[in-house]
Amino acid sequence: MKTWIKWTAGTVGVLIVAAAAAAIVGTQLAERKRNRVIDIKVKPVAIPNDAAAIERGRYLYASRGCVDCHAANGAGRAFIDSGDMKIAGPNISPAPGNVVAKYQSEDWVRTLRHGVKPSGKPLFIMPSEDYNRLTDEDTGALIAYVKSLPPVPGDAGVVKLPLPVKVIYGFGGIPDPVEKIDHSLPPPKPVAAAVTVEHGAYLAAMCIGCHGAGLSGGKIPGGPPDWPAAANITPGDKSVMPAYKDGTSFAAMMKTGKRPDGSAIKVMPFESLRELNEVDVQ
């Protein structure tokens, strides 16, 4: 009996030491990963200043998820605040001294499309994989709108991660945006806005961050443990799409945040999705 107790205690002790060592190493790897410098060569986009382009940028800002992290006025806000985990988007209004105050066109492109700061360090939570396939025209319009916002007070971004998330990130279990993007792809060509597969594919790029490159769903990278997995929205087995009898019922879900049975869907960025116009939502 005493031998068994000693063996058990010894095993537990070894496991505790191993877990502590893994936590230390994982934390160090995470810090190294967040501070690595990535050399991404980008081309600037033209930033227009005409009213039509700025209005297009306003629509993109409202409907492509920007408000969910940066707020409607660009001041930034917390969008994950769960126990030891807090993530807040920074103030991106043209207020003096804020994170984008000195951004040139190349800096915006590198951040939006590639998930890389002007310093070359990776962004942790920016959904650049969603924005990587924006056309040059839409990228320029979005930047133009943000630059047109009135300056408002706000804070820098916050990325506070619990120890398990740091360790998983450090060991590569959670990729940052720069790892999810094919940086060699050229910007896409403009697609006419219409209820077509081509235009739908352009819009569906905004879903990649949560639903994955193939839209087959799964655990949302970097999300809190209480977040549900993103749904499989492809045709076929294990898809949620059979619950929607037609495009109208799916569009209704995008606007209301509710399934056809009336149950609410969690986590989806409905504040943005409800801003989609009738052509885009179809």
Region locations from a protein language model:
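Periplasmic/extracellular electron-transfer cofactor-ligation site
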Residues: 62-86, 114-122, 149-154, 201-228, ...
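Electron-transfer interface patches adjacent to heme c in soluble/periplasmic c-type cytochromes
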Residues: 87-107, 129-139, 213, 228-253, ...
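Short, solvent-exposed interaction modules
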Residues: 110-119, 175-182, 186-190, 253-261
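Electrostatic cytochrome c docking/interface patches
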Residues: 37-62, 171-204
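Membrane-embedded segments
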Residues: 74-150
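Extended, well-folded interaction surfaces typified by the phenylalanyl-tRNA synthetase beta subunit core
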Residues: 154-169
